[in-house]
A protein has these predicted regions:
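Conserved donor NDP-sugar-binding/catalytic core segment of glycosyltransferases
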Residues: 93-130
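A short, conserved alpha-helix in the catalytic core of glycosyltransferases
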Residues: 163-166, 171-190, 194-222
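Short, acidic, metal-binding catalytic loop of nucleotide-sugar glycosyltransferases
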Residues: 25-33
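Short aromatic/hydrophobic "clamp" motif used to bind/position activated sugar donors
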Residues: 85
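Glycine-rich, basic loop-to-helix element that forms the pyrophosphate-binding segment
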Residues: 62-80, 101
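A conserved acidic beta->alpha catalytic loop
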Residues: 25, 40-49, 65
């Protein structure tokens, strides 16, 4: 089997130090990319200049204005030459031997179209990394915050430390560290730029699965992910995610790929979950030791509820 070549594309916005750490980690991956492309999405912290100074071999693309994750990735892939394109969040760090494991997976399995990483918190705790297509129950659990209680629901995300073998046993993998065979990118991509913040990964994986490709988490493709570091300070964020962006993009994914009835059901499940979360937060706020954080996060969830209520309106 021919040995696959690898390109790495890293979109970044105001994450200079994280981006440099991400780039530095590539040297431990066990396989040398044919090229590395950093797409600076209108950063104000000197990211592009720092990368050019510290790592002149890296290709730097500057968008000139904030165009969002999907557009930034698409611009980066235009500059990439590898048979396999690895899209990395700027808040990730590649583990020892991870790139070698990834390249081997694509070289050994011609049916593998998209591969995800064994994502981990800095302390080694497994993160959400892959799963089945979202169900109404899962959407309710996500919006309500009851996922840990309803951990055995259909459609749950896979978080086990072993991930999933390269067998096509998952429907989607996380875009935080997602590798795409070039043939899949050409025929099923690029990323849909109407998904500016979330669900680009689900959407591309859906197209790949429909075209007959397998999607899998690759064992030993370990990636540390500082989850939420790129969005935690954005207006409307609640901790490590942005409810309004995530929930509306989930509804848009359903509308695009599963039809209007599924989209309406998704919106109802998310609204119901959001109301449960807000009711719980109203009681928890009485005992909150960090009133400012409670108010910020609660405002984010309220914004999410309003956004979901309006997302399907003409």
């Amino acid at each position: 089997m021919a040995h696959s070549t690898l390109s790495v594309v890293i979109p970044t916005h105001d994450t200079r130090e994280l981006t440099l750490r991400c780039l530095g980690s590539l040297g431990h991956g066990g396989a040398s990319p044919v090229d590395v492309v950093v797409v600076d999405d209108a950063s104000s912290d000197g990211t592009a200049e720092a990368v050019r100074t510290d790592l002149p071999e890296v290709v730097v693309v500057e968008t000139g204005r904030n165009v969002g994750f999907s557009r930034a990735v698409n611009l980066g892939v235009e500059q990439a030459a590898g048979d396999v394109i690895l899209v990395l969040n700027s808040d990730t760090e590649v583990g020892e031997g991870a790139l070698a494991a990834l390249v081997a997976a694509f070289s050994d399995d011609e049916t593998l179209g998209i591969a995800g990483a064994e994502l981990m918190d800095p302390d080694g705790t497994p993160q959400w990394r892959a799963g089945r297509w979202p169900t109404g129950t899962w959407l309710f659990a996500q919006a309500s915050g009851l996922g840990s209680i309803l951990s055995r629901i259909p459609g749950r995300r896979i978080v086990g430390s072993g991930g999933a073998a390269v067998s096509g046993a998952v429907d989607w993998v996380s875009g935080a560290a997602m590798a795409v065979r070039r043939e899949v990118w050409v025929n099923c991509g690029p990323l849909d730029e109407s998904f500016r913040f979330y669900c680009q990964d689900l959407d591309l994986c859906y197209s790949a699965r429909q075209a007959g490709w397998s999607v899998a988490v690759v064992p030993s493709f370990g990636v540390l992910h500082h989850h939420g570091a790129t969005i935690a300070n954005a207006p409307g964020a609640s901790g490590a995610f942005h409810p309004a962006h995530l929930w509306t993009d989930l509804v848009r994914f359903a509308a695009k790929n599963q039809g209007p009835e599924k989209a309406r059901c998704a919106a109802k499940a998310l609204r119901a979950g959001a109301r449960v979360r807000l009711a719980g937060r109203a009681m928890a706020g009485i005992f909150s030791s960090d009133r400012a954080a409670w108010m910020r996060d609660t405002a984010g969830y309220r914004e999410g509820l309003t956004a979901v209520a309006n997302v399907l309106k003409p």
